[in-house]
Design a protein with these regions (language model features):
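Structured, hydrophobic secondary-structure cores that serve as assembly/anchoring elements
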Residues: 85-203
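Extracellular Cys-Trp
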Residues: 1-97
């Protein structure tokens, strides 16, 4: 718990814990939910084989991953997956991203791959010539009126989190405490936010 408190003071988008044990995963899910929903920190975590049914959890579900130099456990390889997602520009998706270092992993047929994606799993698969990532989904499976299918997509959640963080940071750094809380000044902030959203739309 002390380590998690220290981690939470840093600014980051994706977290992995390569030494995590199975009995710690539920605690991590609760921790991520708490910060995303109550503490204004839109973090995500890559966890090995854990169906968190939550947009803030990436369920990396391979059983083993082999490179030329080492065979990795799923937990160990979550760092690679977190880095891959975090390093993917928001203009593209991590879907089918190649992993050139992988020479073997657990394999499934196309129907099984589709089922895994529908179960909220993100995994490495072999297309017959190379190893690459599956469709880039998070672990959210149960959709609701407030969280529909878009929330299942890693890229869409990343974009929503970026917008949330940008607007919150702008309000804190440039408006709150800098201007009187009048109607006109609120309109200035709304205008700035609207301009930001239009700029994103143009991109």
């Amino acid at each position: 718990q002390d380590s998690l408190k220290k981690i939470a003071t840093e600014r980051f988008d994706y977290l992995s814990i390569p030494t995590v044990e199975a009995d710690q995963l539920e605690t991590l899910l609760t921790w991520v939910k708490s910060y995303r929903e109550n503490k204004y920190k839109k973090m995500k975590i890559v966890m090995p084989g854990y169906d968190g049914d939550y947009e803030g959890v990436i369920n990396f579900s391979n059983k083993y991953i082999k490179t030329a130099t080492k065979t990795y456990t799923p937990a160990e390889y979550t760092a690679r997956i977190a880095g891959l997602i975090a390093g993917t520009p928001l203009t593209i998706s991590a879907t089918y991203a190649p992993l050139n270092e992988v020479i073997d992993c657990d394999k499934y047929d196309l129907d099984e791959n589709d089922e895994k994606v529908n179960n909220g799993e993100f995994f490495i698969w072999y297309d017959g010539t190379k190893y690459k990532m599956s469709r880039a989904v998070n672990s959210l499976v149960t959709t609701t009126q407030g969280k529909q299918e878009g929330y299942q997509t890693i890229k869409i959640v990343d974009i929503m989190d970026m917008i949330y963080d940008d607007i919150r940071t702008t309000a804190q750094d440039s408006y709150i405490g800098k201007y009187a809380n009048t109607y006109d000044n609120k309109c200035l902030l709304i205008t700035a936010i609207t301009g930001y959203l239009k700029e994103l739309e143009g991109e």
